[in-house]
């Protein structure tokens, strides 16, 4: 099996991509590849917020639930995984430190400053650039990540899985 670590959470709502989008990506990959398992990571609170939508329609045997686990265990699983998909977050940096290939989603934050370092890592940005985000009042209760399309993320993952 190839293991893809998925982190839908983060500490700021404006930079969170929808859990339903992650679910679409996961289900699409499972239609094309029969050797993928998903390792879901985050806090216990994030599990409450995202788990149901994340795993909707996915066989539980293909899910490894690490929500609420400590960083040591999460890090150990990352070391044995093939890919990380997630928002701009501390767990994204933990994945980088474990030499995991990272696909990180960015919107209102600067990927040149906060993005994953390393040649093999990929940043997918919203179509809105940083100047746009600097020019508006950011509502802390609203996601600004909706211009990232699931097909874009799927295409990037498929290139990295080859």
Language-model features: where?
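Short, Lys/Arg-enriched, disordered terminal segments
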Residues: 1, 31, 35, 59, ...
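Leloir-type glycosyltransferase catalytic cores
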Residues: 119-162
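Donor-binding and catalytic core of enzymes assembling or modifying cell-surface/extracellular glycoconjugates
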Residues: 19-107
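Flexible, glycine-rich phosphate/dinucleotide-binding loops
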Residues: 13, 47, 111, 130
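Conserved donor-binding/catalytic core segment of Leloir-type glycosyltransferases
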Residues: 1-13
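Short clusters of hydrophobic/aromatic residues that line enzyme substrate/ligand-binding pockets
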Residues: 66, 114, 145-148
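Glycine/threonine-rich flexible loop motifs
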Residues: 14-18
């Amino acid at each position: 099996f190839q293991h893809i670590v998925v982190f839908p959470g983060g500490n700021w709502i404006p930079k969170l991509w929808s859990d339903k989008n992650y679910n679409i990506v996961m289900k699409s990959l499972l239609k094309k590849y029969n050797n993928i398992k998903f390792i879901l990571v985050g806090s216990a609170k994030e599990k409450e917020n995202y788990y149901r939508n994340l795993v909707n329609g996915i066989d539980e045997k293909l899910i490894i639930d690490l929500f609420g686990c400590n960083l040591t265990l999460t890090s150990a699983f990352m070391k044995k995984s093939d890919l990380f998909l997630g928002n701009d977050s501390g767990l994204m940096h933990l994945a980088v430190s474990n030499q995991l290939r990272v696909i990180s989603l960015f919107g209102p934050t600067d990927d040149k400053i906060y993005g994953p370092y390393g040649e093999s890592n990929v940043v997918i940005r919203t179509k809105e650039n940083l100047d746009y985000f600097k020019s508006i009042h950011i509502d802390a209760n609203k996601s600004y990540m909706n211009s990232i399309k699931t097909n874009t993320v799927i295409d990037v993952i498929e290139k990295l899985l080859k």
